[in-house]
Amino acid sequence: MNQANFYIAGDWGTSNLRLYLVDTISGQCAATKSGPGISQVNANEIPDLLARLCEPWLQQHNISYSIYCGMVGSTIGWADAGYLDCPLDLNSLANKLCSPPNANMRSQIIPGVRCNSPTGATDVMRGEETQILGAIQKSPELLFGKHLLCLPGTHNKWVALKDGVVESFITSVCGELFSSLTKHSVLTRGATTSEFDKQYFIDGVIRSSEQRRTDLIHLLFETRSRQLGGQLPQKASADFLSGLIIGRDLLGACDLYSQVRLNTSVKIIADSSLSDLYALAGDQLDIPTDCLDGQELSRMGIHSLYRAANAL
């Protein structure tokens, strides 16, 4: 059993690293740090990088354990932690933690999750599994019946739960699509950063619903043509585009998982900057939503696995 007062938890994705100093008993976060994403670090540099980032914590506290989720456990990370297959009780992740090489303390990496998606293809996640586990702990009603969860981000995850077990999920590339189109296409070219325009976002959501029979690929250029026709201010073009993409994401996922979502709200797990957009879109589409804080749930999920792995 780990007798230290604190341990280090890390959510280490491709682009960013978030480190948490966590109380071993309560699971409360005492401090945070950030660092480079795993794509910016060589695997053999990771132990020294963590030592530098965590040095103040290590000097002040008796810390002998760290645990990580995300792309740190991929083939481009510190060590390949593999995947566990669905259907999956996420508590079983604690039995398959991976120990990376050359660690400066006892360290473990949480595996990812793999499934056959509703379209029949293989799909995978890394990092989101801890948020889902945290959501189940925070909202015990997820242990009973069928529920649909949405975890927005660069690659959104739509997750079907049945009695607290992950049955399947599917990925939508909404975040990456929006980023690519706003940075590398003519659709929003010339638009300057401005305050969020709620009405034009809603217009995009409604348009995505009105033209539900039309493929999204045939709607996207309206972001440009509406500007040329005087129907859409250039400064609001990104908000209209966001509404189109998010609206269609919600509609498509709810169609795929129509039997999962019966009589239940969609749980949106993300930072408020994203979850608020999905909730607003859901309001326009008559899709009820509940928003949960992604970072809080990630810490809760990691802490649950920490306690299981250390027999607390």
Model-derived regions, located:
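Short glycine-rich, Thr/Ser-proximal phosphate-binding strand/loop in the N-terminal lobe
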Residues: 6-45, 292
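Short glycine-aspartate micro-motif
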Residues: 7-11, 65-69, 147-151, 267
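Glycine-rich phosphate-binding loops at beta-strand->alpha-helix junctions
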Residues: 16, 262-281
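N-terminal phosphate-binding loop and adjacent alpha-helix
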Residues: 29-65, 73-76, 80, 189-190
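Glycine-rich phosphate-binding loop plus the immediately following alpha-helix
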Residues: 41-42, 115-209
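Short beta-strand-loop/turn "lid" adjacent to the catalytic site in phosphate-handling enzymes
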Residues: 57-122, 163
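Adenine-nucleotide phosphate-binding core of ATP-dependent small-molecule kinases
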Residues: 209-252
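Glycine-rich phosphate-binding/hydrolytic loop that grips phosphoryl groups
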Residues: 280, 290-312
